[in-house]
């Protein structure tokens, strides 16, 4: 399905994933199988981030009331619209999940210059991608997404003043 969006070319990893990040992807694949999905989507990545309990993403999500219990019912009720098919790569990842993984790699390499990509980059990229099932699930679960974004940055030791306009485009907004 071509939705008119420009697709990024899947980058080869130039920095390695942390053990926690690799575990998130494994748990996402496991969640997709448990759900009977023929693909691994952003909703499964979100479940993987929650199930992996040691990473920044898991801690921030749990601190903001995003739990596996809340998400499982919402995910199991998700159905593709009639006539639409999830397009996926050979590994079963949807294009939107690939976009998030690309975005995480870009953030880690180009903006934060880290040596390993951790779970926090999956969470930041999910929020910044904006149009994905995982983000809609967080919002439906009652999460304050900007708060999650800024708490993730704070957990990384980032100066929050430099990121006030990331989500709003307005440097005066973005924080309480």
Which residue stretches match the model-derived regions?
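Histone-fold recognition with a strong bias for associated Lys/Arg-rich disordered tails
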Residues: 1-176
């Amino acid at each position: 399905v071509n939705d008119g969006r420009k697709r990024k070319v899947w980058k080869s990893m130039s920095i390695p994933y942390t053990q926690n990040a690799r575990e998130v992807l494994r748990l996402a694949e496991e969640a997709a199988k448990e759900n009977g999905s023929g693909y691994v989507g952003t909703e499964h990545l979100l479940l993987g981030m929650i199930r992996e309990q040691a990473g920044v993403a898991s801690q921030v999500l749990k601190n903001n009331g995003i739990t596996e219990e809340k998400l499982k019912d919402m995910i199991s009720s998700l159905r593709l619209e009639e006539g639409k098919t999830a397009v996926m790569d050979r590994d079963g990842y949807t294009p939107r999940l690939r976009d998030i993984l690309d975005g995480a790699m870009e953030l880690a390499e180009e903006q934060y210059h880290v040596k390993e990509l951790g779970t926090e980059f999956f969470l930041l990229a999910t929020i910044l991608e904006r149009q994905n099932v995982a983000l809609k699930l967080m919002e439906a679960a009652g999460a304050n997404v900007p708060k999650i974004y800024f708490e993730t940055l704070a957990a990384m030791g980032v100066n929050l003043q430099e990121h006030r306009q990331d989500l709003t485009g307005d440097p005066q907004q973005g924080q309480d």
